[in-house]
Curated annotation (Swiss-Prot):
The lineage of its organism: Bacteria, Pseudomonadati, Pseudomonadota, Gammaproteobacteria, Enterobacterales. The gene is cysC. This is Adenylyl-sulfate kinase. Keywords: ATP-binding, Kinase, Nucleotide-binding, Phosphoprotein, Transferase. Belongs to the APS kinase family. InterPro entries: APS_kinase, P-loop_NTPase.
Length: 201
């Protein structure tokens, strides 16, 4: 990774993060959805974004597949590329949090070290790890993209849960049962955001 040039300096903005948050009426924060492919991350994150939007909360959803069409289109699925994928997404999420948004990210992000890296980059109280815990057998039965079938057939290498490890969170801010109804999971997340004074009741 390239080092910073000594002539590149950080410029403070005239409008502060606090002012942006006052404008939005809520705090800026990242909800980092993690779990196996097919666990329901994107589905739950999308449903939560809809619920927040209806409440007037300024949001943005960053989806694992979508960013690989542009921001991360040059990356593959090696451990090194996955780390860089998460680093880039973390930096984008950080900028959005500075803008006062509630950012929802739906990424397998299989390694604890990468998730911790983003947590530290965001800072205290700005990173909420959401573990969508769905058994591998259920994820494989759902297989919405047909990826498990390809992985089992040897057509897809380095697939998380099959021939690449997934490190489950040890201390996620919220642990969701991915077999529950999406509406129930959204209510749990809304309760957490309200109790944490991120959004208003």
């Amino acid at each position: 990774m390239a080092q910073h040039d000594e002539n590149v300096v950080w410029h403070a903005h005239p409008v502060t993060q606090q002012q942006r948050e006052q404008h939005h009426g809520h705090r800026g924060v990242v909800l980092w959805f993690t779990g196996l492919s097919g666990s329901g991350k994107s589905t739950v994150a999308g449903a939560l974004e809809e619920a927040l939007h209806e409440r007037g909360v300024s949001t943005y959803l960053l989806d694992g597949d979508n960013v690989r069409h542009g921001l991360c289109s040059d990356l593959g699925f090696s451990d090194e590329d996955r780390k860089e994928n998460i680093r880039r997404v973390g930096e984008v999420a950080r900028l959005m949090v500075d803008a006062g948004l509630v950012v929802l990210t739906a990424f397998i992000s299989p390694h604890r070290a990468e998730r911790q890296m983003v947590r530290e980059r965001l800072g205290e109280g700005r990173f909420i790890e959401v573990f969508v815990d769905t058994p591998l057998a259920i994820c494989e039965a759902r297989d919405p993209k047909g990826l498990y079938k390809k992985a089992r057939a040897g057509e897809l290498r380095n697939f998380t849960g099959i021939d690449s490890v997934y490190e489950a969170p040890e201390k996620a801010e919220i642990h969701l049962d991915g077999e529950q109804l999406v509406t129930n999971l959204v209510h749990q997340l809304l309760d957490l955001l309200q109790q944490s004074d991120i959004i208003r009741s």
